[in-house]
Amino acid sequence: MKVFYVTLYLLFVLSLTAKAQDSVKVALVQAHLAWGDVDANLRDFDKRVRSCKGCDMIVFPELFTSGCEMKKRDKEEAVCSKDGVASYYPLVIKRMRKWAKRSGALVVGSTIYKEEGKYYNRLLAVYPDGKYEYYDKHNCFKKGSFSPGDRHLALEWKGIRFSTYICYDLRFPEWSWNH
């Protein structure tokens, strides 16, 4: 079942440096996600990235690889689903690197990451040279669904500094101010 998912990342401009260009062209890429089907979603976003010619930054929705599956019948089903999506993490990074290199843009999106038995809603920011940075969502809306991250991510791209947030983290600006 495909569902239209609306949550977007908001990137706040923190400061401009002397080398900053006049503007940054940002593509906010939205899609009808195939819930839990990482392969189908990656194929779909591959097509969508091709239409982002001339963009400096390409931003995908929260959990763009799988959708945000909040209504599982039981905990076991939810864990099984997260394990499946988290197993794609290396492929997601590889695909985002390809998109960043091909487009020359900074590519930003989040997916599920698993480490030491804990799940994180991880935002990845991938540069055209293949390097990437990340932060894990700090304020998780539903307790127990994801483990909270403990660091903030500010990026500089094309001479402009950005601060990254995933959805609900915007409701807690003091966390950002303190980091």
Language-model regions, residue ranges each:
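Bacterial N-terminal signal peptides
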Residues: 6-15
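Boundary at the C-terminal end of the N-terminal hydrophobic targeting segment
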Residues: 18-22
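Short, basic, glycine/proline-bearing loop/turn elements
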Residues: 27-36, 75-84, 159-161
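Active-site-proximal beta-strand/loop segments in catalytic clefts of secreted hydrolases
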Residues: 29-31, 61-63, 110-112, 138, ...
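N-terminal phosphate-binding loop and adjacent alpha-helix
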Residues: 30-48
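Cys-nucleophile CN-hydrolase/nitrilase-fold catalytic domain and related Cys-dependent amidase chemistry
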Residues: 47-128
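Active-site catalytic loop in hydrolytic enzyme cores
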Residues: 114-179
